[in-house]
UniProtKB/Swiss-Prot annotation:
It comes from Saccharolobus solfataricus (strain ATCC 35092 / DSM 1617 / JCM 11322 / P2). It comes from the Archaea. This is Phosphomethylpyrimidine synthase 1. It catalyses: 5-amino-1-(5-phospho-beta-D-ribosyl)imidazole + S-adenosyl-L-methionine = 4-amino-2-methyl-5-(phosphooxymethyl)pyrimidine + CO + 5'-deoxyadenosine + formate + L-methionine + 3 H(+). InterPro entries: ThiC/Bza_core_dom, ThiC/BzaA/B.
Amino acid sequence: MAIIEEARSGQITDEMKEISKLEGIPVEKVRNRISECKIILIRNAKYPSKKLVPIGKGLTTKVNINIGTSDEVVNLQMELEKVKVANRWGDTLMDLSTGGDLDDIRREIIRASELPVGTVPVYQVFIESFKKKSGGAYFTEDELLSTVEKHLKDGVAFMTIHAGITKELAIRALKSNRIIPIVSRGGDMIAGWMIHNNSENPYRKHWGYLLEMFKEYDAVISLGDALRPGATGDAHDEFQVGELLETARLVKSALKEGVQVMVEGPGHVPLNEIAWDVKLMKKLTGGVPYYVLGPLPIDVGAPYDHIASAIGAAISSAAGADLLCYLTPAEHLGLPTVKQVEEGAIAYRIAAHAGDVVKLGRRVRKWDDEVSYYRGKLEWDNMISRLIDPQRAYQVYTQFGIPKVKACTMCGGYCPMMWAMDQVRKIGSSSSL
């Protein structure tokens, strides 16, 4: 039985109990929110990952790590090193490979990952069509559906399914004065297929069958945003919002069938529009989990888009976004290295926690309070061991050698905390104060 159906029947399962313990919320609240798809469990029930990853209302914000080859750079060993980074810093992992033996790469990544793995199945069918038929848009509807099924059988836990874009929306977007008509790779593949074949979106045509497949594996449909804004000047235009309205209808039909679903979001969004972007999506979809790419509040940040987008990600998390898709320093410029993947992952781990301090309050802020307490006491071992990256923190703390005094090498003997502790002792021992 699918987890939504278990929840709707009143069952309290071991997974629900584990989510309750992991997140610190009552198990009945977990069950109720799963029944409404306000909490989902990112997993393939037939091939569960090592890490249990619940996403949704009242839970800590999770971080997704994208990796994968390109047709320019095919290096499986490098991608497997990225998996190690994801295992340390991430909650979910997506294989976005477009170069090499895609079946072999996907299976190797799934084997190496401790996290639930997601894919974008249209990539594979489009690329194989391009190689075999000299055109990416020549794949058949059966080939697309077979590829989705193959990914599920391999243990994929969630997939980006670009079902919200219609042929009419695609044509209008391509003819529009948008700064960039379509920036979603998978979305553009679906748009190209619809135009080439003069046919409606194959995902929409076979939506019922897709729901059956995902329900069998109790995997998650991640409804892709093919018309997400790729420039801040395109944010919340008629095409982004039009697709979101279509997506909201698909969400309702998925929930009716007991299929776990989440919605993907932008993209490039000005800072002042990020919070209400989250609220708009939640309102239209009934509060299902929101999986956001950033968003990036500026378009000029590369090669620092991991920093720029982390600002947007923190705001979206605070406003209620549930899963953050990270960006790396290589975003908009090229395939990321292992180091760049780590830099992006850390930036998003920080953004997620910053958002959670607002969204969840005391439940998560006690971590910050502990660190601050030990910092105020100059108890370096206790403080550093609780930081987001203790190893790196210790390297910085000792980069000029062990400090000569109890303070760090920035303030040295003039450390305000050191002086304050001394002043407290003097006040305590003085009868005149």
